[in-house]
Design a protein with these regions (language model features):
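Residues on the lipid-exposed face of transmembrane beta-strands in outer-membrane beta-barrel proteins
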Residues: 14-20, 59-65, 89, 115-121, ...
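Outer-membrane pore/translocation modules
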Residues: 38-154
Length: 245
């Protein structure tokens, strides 16, 4: 591998999420199963490597704090959206495909605990939304990291602050402007800090379309616009398909 060459990585991540909505004391909630699949490819000069497989299977629990009452299907159709806040808790498991001797893996081979609180404000009954999300992610240590003579990989907690502004153009189409600020998350190999903590700002935009009965298509684009010198340049294109029953 030519260490003077730039390193480029491409990640294709696909996730299937199945959610069961629930009634928690009159508030909307839900429990989701997340089944991810990941393809990772990297190259530098003449060096190339890739891997693919099932990533870390996860579960997501959510409960509304205010503004989101539990509704029947008939009530949901006529419900007028209002300002709301919710709590989300994601649990990532070390159940994906993992090779301890490879630095490139679909799975990270560790547990992940990630609570999120959001506040979503609408001044006009759901046509305009101003939203913020605050997430803290805590990682356990990967004690089976056997790359280049190492034995374990750890990571500091990572904080993500999101801001979103969206506007319905029609009842079926909406546009969004998005921002993400990441801080922390430095990794440690055998307790040696890797000087790769995030202090990163990403900006993006998105479009959503209600394409069929109970179904949405959402496309987002994001790009890193401010970062420490040791952090990589990054662009993300994401497409989400949702079906409600």
């Amino acid at each position: 591998m030519d260490i003077t060459s730039d390193v480029r990585a491409n990640v294709l991540s696909q996730s299937f999420m199945l959610t069961r909505t629930m009634d928690y004391w009159g508030r909307t909630g839900g429990l989701s199963l997340v089944l991810p699949y990941r393809y990772v490819e990297t190259h530098s000069g003449d060096f190339r490597a890739s891997t693919r497989g099932i990533s870390d299977i996860g579960m997501l629990w959510q409960i509304n704090l205010f503004g989101g009452p539990a509704l029947s299907r008939e009530q949901f159709r006529s419900f007028i959206p209002e300002t709301f806040s919710s709590f989300h808790f994601y649990l990532g498991t070390p159940l994906g495909e993992y090779d301890a001797h490879s630095a490139l893996n679909p799975s990270s081979n560790r547990w992940v605990f990630s609570p999120t609180v959001n506040y979503s404000y609408t001044p006009d009954q759901g046509w305009t939304w101003l939203e913020t999300y605050i997430t803290t992610t805590v990682f356990t240590t990967n004690d089976n990291y056997q790359v280049a003579g190492a034995s374990k990989l750890g990571q500091d907690p990572l904080v993500i602050i999101e801001g979103h502004a969206s506007r319905n153009i029609t009842p079926e189409i909406w546009l969004s402007l998005d921002s993400y600020y990441n801080v922390g998350g430095e990794t440690h190999i055998d307790n040696i800090a890797q000087d790769n903590a995030a202090n990163t700002l990403r900006l993006g935009t998105g479009i959503g379309i209600r394409a069929w009965g109970g179904g949405d298509i959402i496309v987002n684009y994001e790009r890193v616009v401010a970062k420490p010198s040791q952090q990589p340049e990054s662009q993300t294109i994401r497409m989400t398909l949702r079906q409600f029953w």
